[in-house]
């Protein structure tokens, strides 16, 4: 009898599926310090709440990829992931900075511009 119950439970689990829910990434772009033209700073792109963990994150200067460093991929209590990508930069009031995120939950890359006033 216990074997039958175990087989029924196993069958029910296979019907419901065990795959994790896919989650769309949340993107925040910000500088470490308030922006001052000509003063070195750090540009951060913090991407959180996404699943599955495979993701591509680029910081862009006038649409061109910048050389970046990144934190280790980490996960939250709800098993969603987060990652910080960052680089040093010197704002000048002319160049435009943004973060581009590509993830399986997105139909096209998500681009979030840095707002120097935030």
Curated annotation (Swiss-Prot):
Keyword Signal set for record: yes
Top-level taxon of the source organism: Eukaryota
Entry's localization field: Secreted
InterPro entries registered for this protein in UniProt: B2Microglobulin (IPR015707), Ig-like_dom (IPR007110), Ig-like_dom_sf (IPR036179), Ig-like_fold (IPR013783), Ig/MHC_CS (IPR003006), Ig_C1-set (IPR003597), MHC/Immunoglobulin (IPR050160)
Statement: the UniProt record of this protein carries the keyword Hydrolase: no
Stretches that traverse the bilayer: none
Cystine bridges: 45-99
Sorted UniProt keywords: Disulfide bond, Immunity, Immunoglobulin domain, MHC I, Secreted, Signal
Function: Component of the class I major histocompatibility complex (MHC). Involved in the presentation of peptide antigens to the immune system.
Family: Belongs to the beta-2-microglobulin family.
Assembly mode: Heterodimer of an alpha chain and a beta chain. Beta-2-microglobulin is the beta-chain of major histocompatibility complex class I molecules.
Protein known as: Beta-2-microglobulin
Species name: Equus asinus
Recorded name of the encoding gene: B2M
